[in-house]
Amino acid sequence: MTGEAVIWQAQSESASTATALTDLVSVEGLQGYIDEALENNASLQQTLITLRKAQVAIKSADAADNLNVDASFSGTKTENSEANYTSGVTVSWEVDLWQKISDSVTAASFDAASARSAYQSSRYALVASVIRSYLDIITQKQLLAIEQERLRVYENSESIILKRYRTGLGSLDDLDNAKTSSANTRASIALYENTISAAKRTLAVLLGRQDQTLSDFPSVTEFPDVLQPLLALPEQDLARRPDLQAAYYAIKASEANVKVAYKALLPSINLSAGLTDNGTTPSQSLFTNPLWNLLGQVTAPLFQGGALRAQIDDAELTSLNSWWQYRETLLNAVQEVQDALDNEKAFTQRQYYTDIAYRNALNSAETFSGQYRQGLVDILDLLSVYDTTFNLQAQRVELQYSQLSNRIDLGLALGLGVSQ
């Protein structure tokens, strides 16, 4: 099952071809943060170490097919006798008659390939997280600016109310209502300021920094353009996902381990040759007149309490489980792509209607402001219109962030990552 039967819903004609997540977005300072995260992120470095351990395991498995050379030297001295020194060299080799060692190397190689793909998947996910975190900081800055503008309007309303009161056109109750709105907005400003600091700390952790103030964050306040990635053939898009590749290599490794488990039941052939010598001094024992021996040995397991059969069952179940893990990974991949495509459509529609509502709210705010000055509406009506206008403005920002973040998710679902 590789995704050939998957049918994607149509996507926007504005989608663009890209080969990496960084191709989707271009903004000041972002690439530097991505490079820093790939170099210093603690979680990614742990995944890299796991990959290196898997690569070392290949050498360990391959070493079983090499000659083993052992050297020994000993000396003894007993009462009423001369000292005796013995030296020896032994060369041994296991004949890989059944390709058991070869299968072990194959399994280790596929394990390393799976670890390499898992590392690549971690790199892709990290880049996506850095981009989303960067966009989140910009979002919180914009929301803070909206609240600050809301506060400015409310404070201006307080001044207007005082002027009207002094001329006998209003009451102090109106002023209390305006001050209530101002105080509530100040609380929101404090919240957004804290949210910005928290978002910067989140990005700093991704970058692997101890100093989490992120004082070098660019003075960017506008969203960058984030392209919608172009969906090609489903099997091509899903095939480049590293998590699917990792799951596939895990299957191949488990299949090789099943072969190793079965071949453990077969006889093994070992060849060894040795040289030994002894003497009353160390120099005399260093092969001045050595004896040699040659040994061929065949061993076969007869009874081990069912351990070997249990190992076979375990290997087969592990292999079966890896197939189900691959299927689960594939189905999740299909769902992620389809969800992102549906979200793109929904966000586009929501933005369209929210923009209409925002324009209407601006017109209403202007109308109600004039009517309030004429005494046709009270302050509660005016503040309600202002609230609606600013809330819609904030909603537009949040929708835009959600759409841009969703495009990053779509790129990640399609296997876009970062260049090597």
Region spans (language model):
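Transmembrane beta-barrel architecture of outer-membrane proteins
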Residues: 32, 84-86, 132, 177, ...
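Periplasmic alpha-helical coiled-coil/stalk elements that build and connect Gram-negative outer-membrane
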Residues: 101, 117-233, 343, 347, ...
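Terminal intrinsically disordered/low-complexity segments used for targeting and assembly
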Residues: 1-36, 193-239, 412-420
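Small/polar (Gly/Ser/Thr/Ala-rich) solvent-exposed segments
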Residues: 45, 65-84, 92-121, 245, ...
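Membrane-embedded beta-strand positions in outer-membrane beta-barrel channels/transporters
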Residues: 34, 88-90, 134, 234, ...
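Acidic, low-complexity, intrinsically disordered peripheral segments
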Residues: 225, 374, 395-420
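Alpha-helical hairpins and coiled-coil heptad-repeat segments
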Residues: 158-175, 364-382
